[in-house]
Amino acid sequence: MAPSAVGLLVFLLQAALALNPEDPNVCSHWESYAVTVQESYAHPFDQIYYTRCADILNWFKCTRHRISYKTAYRRGLRTMYRRRSQCCPGYYENGDFCIPLCTEECMHGRCVSPDTCHCEPGWGGPDCSSGCDSEHWGPHCSNRCQCQNGALCNPITGACVCAPGFRGWRCEELCAPGTHGKGCQLLCQCHHGASCDPRTGECLCAPGYTGVYCEELCPPGSHGAHCELRCPCQNGGTCHHITGECACPPGWTGAVCAQPCPPGTFGQNCSQDCPCHHGGQCDHVTGQCHCTAGYMGDRCQEECPFGTFGFLCSQRCDCHNGGQCSPATGACECEPGYKGPSCQERLCPEGLHGPGCTLPCPCDTENTISCHPVTGACTCQPGWSGHYCNESCPAGYYGNGCQLPCTCQNGADCHSITGSCTCAPGFMGEVCAVPCAAGTYGPNCSSVCSCSNGGTCSPVDGSCTCREGWQGLDCSLPCPSGTWGLNCNETCICANGAACSPFDGSCACTPGWLGDSCELPCPDGTFGLNCSEHCDCSHADGCDPVTGHCCCLAGWTGIRCDSTCPPGRWGPNCSVSCSCENGGSCSPEDGSCECAPGFRGPLCQRICPPGFYGHGCAQPCPLCVHSRGPCHHISGICECLPGFSGALCNQVCAGGHFGQDCAQLCSCANNGTCSPIDGSCQCFPGWIGKDCSQACPSGFWGSACFHTCSCHNGASCSAEDGACHCTPGWTGLFCTQRCPSAFFGKDCGHICQCQNGASCDHITGKCTCRTGFSGRHCEQRCAPGTFGYGCQQLCECMNNATCDHVTGTCYCSPGFKGIRCDQAALMMDELNPYTKISPALGAERHSVGAVTGIVLLLFLVVVLLGLFAWRRRRQKEKGRDLAPRVSYTPAMRMTSTDYSLSDLSQSSSHAQCFSNASYHTLACGGPATSQASTLDRNSPTKLSNKSLDRDTAGWTPYSYVNVLDSHFQISALEARYPPEDFYIELRHLSRHAEPHSPGTCGMDRRQNTYIMDKGFKDYMKESVCSSSTCSLNSSENPYATIKDPPILTCKLPESSYVEMKSPVHLGSPYTDVPSLSTSNKNIYEVGRCLT
């Protein structure tokens, strides 16, 4: 994006979020900033010229030099000013609005101005937290409430809002039995004889019951009234929920189940005897025996198995070398020749035995663990056997002493030490008991078979055993023609072109032949494949054994040689009528019936049996899925049940159709789904009715309108999902929240237009005006003569006194006093500040003092003029006024939203403006042609035939013109004012100028800011400050008001500029003049004014 576009976008975003200076809560202040400008100055240079002289050698022409000046330009810094908008004190910025800030939250109202709350009806106090107490109501809480039994009194109407459980006009009556709650509208739900509290509806349960509705028994561990009594039962005993009597669990007895069953008994009520032996103890609850050490079993009847001892026989004996272990203690009883706690110590050293340990052991040392120290018997290592441990385990045995039998199967080898199996080819598994899975063979079944066409694979070597009809190593080759059977070793014996099956050698005869080898022709009267068809010829000499074509006798024709007789006739001379029914035809010879498809019987009077159809009822029906029975007896078509279609009645009716053959159209509306069987509708959430055309009743939603809406304040809810559609003035998920402050209406989408601190109704947006204001938006003050809330109170002020529109306070006219200004008063300035006479009237009463002051002022002006003339002469001597004449040049382009200076040029008047460094007086001089005019509130100076242009009318009543450099000369200044007041702010920021001619029009600069306003109903009138000596002294009022700006003519000692600023509607709080053409400041460079 181009930089200019980025800048424009940033500016527009700032403008969109900026404060509106028109907002009454927006204040502004000026701030300075420096900009680089180009300014002109007089640059000296040496100019050579020629003149006539007496130099005869140069033909009377001499060269001369002189210092001349030309206009040059240089860059300099200039201080400029811009206005920054910000929220006034007591307000904070929220988006592009200034919102009032209340230190204390308005509890029942809204903040309308700093620390000022507008309370809702019935509330008061600084933070709207104080309402009428419970005993009073009405205006000023002056009426006493009549409500009883803790009822609330409406602070506005005094109506009693009964507490739950009471009724009546004054809430003096309790709810009727069986009812409770607010307005006694709720029915009690208590069970088991419980009573209901009329206030809360709380059930007062009978002893032994609890729960919200007393529907539950007391929880375990409690009983009695309110289930407050703790059960004394111990060890899991349960008490009666009413009496508290204990029912003990098995194994416990006593009043509180604190005593276990006596020894030798157990179970419920300790009624069972213990069955334990050998001193075993019985568990008093379950009866399980806890055996003593050395015994085990359900009844402790078994001694610990060999090699174990101790409690539950859980410990392993540690006796070696054949030592026996005590089943109770685990102590070892050693064999002769061994000693020690575990019998692990030999009496003879290793390798010796016999008396005196003198005989060497005869065992094979590599395969022997040890030899017996007494007998010298060898103890072999696992996998070895024999007297001297020199023989490996025999086949089928392994381990210590070769005592363990091998478990390997199917010819597998067993490892003599570990007993692990090495399987033969074709088997797998830990003991080689699992044959190879189909398709695998070899050691560990690791190879994959390659047999095809159902051939079986040998699990040993993978060789293929082919099925009948196949041959080859992988059974992929079919038997050659003429052979069949296993390995294709059999020869076919089929004749007459019959095909031989390669699997079993059976012959598939061609039509007209039969027999095992197809060597026999079809018998007379038959034909076709396997001679299964019978010839149907009348008056024929048989039929073709292959095709079945009839060989008719002479005189007969037709497919069956029966076309002689007409239809329906048979017998001699076709004299007998056929009796066949249902479209059957009869034989012309004997009248036998040939039934039409779908019928059977001698006269074709019966339909096909269920499950068959067609000619001769020979064709089986297809499998009809959802039908009324088998297929149609003629066509074989399935007769579908309502809701199904398709050749097999296995298709559900398409959407929108139902009934028999799916011929009926569904009538379900609003996305309801239709049953394909009977057309009944299953409605979409939000709809009910036979055809789903009825919306859910108000207050219900969802499927079958089952759910109840939770919306409040008159909101409607969506019949589909229960979403609330709030009425105007409400928001939130269930429409329980009022619109936020300053918003109202549908979806809180309207902004309140109330002014002057008025409150806005959150539903209608109607303004409730503060005291002293009226109008639709409370934009109007009370009309003269009225005041107060709604401007309904009449002022009681007398003698032309002014009435305050808010409080009704009277401001008396001169000469009166009192609350209603009905008392006469002395005309003295010191007595009444509201009746102080104007400065003009004081001047008339003290004319002598005024004349004296004027004489002194004129003398002072003469002295000042002399000083300025002397200073100006010195400046001319230094050559400061040699810069060429400079015309006004706008520093930037004016836009339709800014003000412009029209016909801005230099005046031909001789009047000059200057500034005095000592007395800070702004003055303009010229020949005196009119009387002096004091620029104050009562004596405005008028502008003659001039106006200030503004291109558009939509502007605010405040505008500023800043004189930021020295005084300047402006003529032909024209201003067209809108209907509002127009303010011009003059600021002097330059160095002092020198007077040019006598006669001054001065402004005192002890306050450097002056505001001139104009009532725009009148245009400016003529008044030229060029002939008289008029001054503005603002020491008495630093913001003296000038009804019309005067015409000022000036001579500028240096480059100056004029700044005109239009109000900002929605601009940035910092409006920078040199930035964009839409800026609200215009800067004009002002050149040196000439006389």
UniProtKB/Swiss-Prot annotation:
Domain EGF-like, first and last residues per copy: 94-129, 142-172, 180-215, 223-258, 266-301, 314-344, 398-433, 441-476, 484-519, 570-605, 613-650, 658-693, 706-736, 749-779, 787-822
Cysteines joined through disulfide linkages: 27-88, 53-62, 87-98, 102-117, 119-128, 145-153, 147-160, 162-171, 184-196, 190-203, 205-214, 227-239, 233-246, 248-257, 270-282, 276-289, 291-300, 317-325, 319-332, 334-343, 402-414, 408-421, 423-432, 445-457, 451-464, 466-475, 488-500, 494-507, 509-518, 574-586, 580-593, 595-604, 617-631, 621-638, 640-649, 662-674, 668-681, 683-692, 709-717, 711-724, 726-735, 752-760, 754-767, 769-778, 791-803, 797-810, 812-821
GO cellular component, as recorded: basolateral plasma membrane
Chief subcellular location: membrane
Coiled coil stretches, renumbered: none
Ranges facing Cytoplasmic side: 869-1091
Membrane side Extracellular: residue ranges: 19-847
Membrane topology: Single-pass type I membrane protein
GO BP terms: homotypic cell-cell adhesion; retina layer formation
Signal peptide: 1-18
Domain EMI, residue spans: 23-100
Subunit structure: Homomer. Does not interact with MEGF10.
Family of the protein in this entry: Belongs to the MEGF family.
General function of this protein: May regulate the mosaic spacing of specific neuron subtypes in the retina through homotypic retinal neuron repulsion. Mosaics provide a mechanism to distribute each cell type evenly across the retina, ensuring that all parts of the visual field have access to a full set of processing elements.
Protein name stated in the entry: Multiple epidermal growth factor-like domains protein 11
Gene behind this protein: Megf11
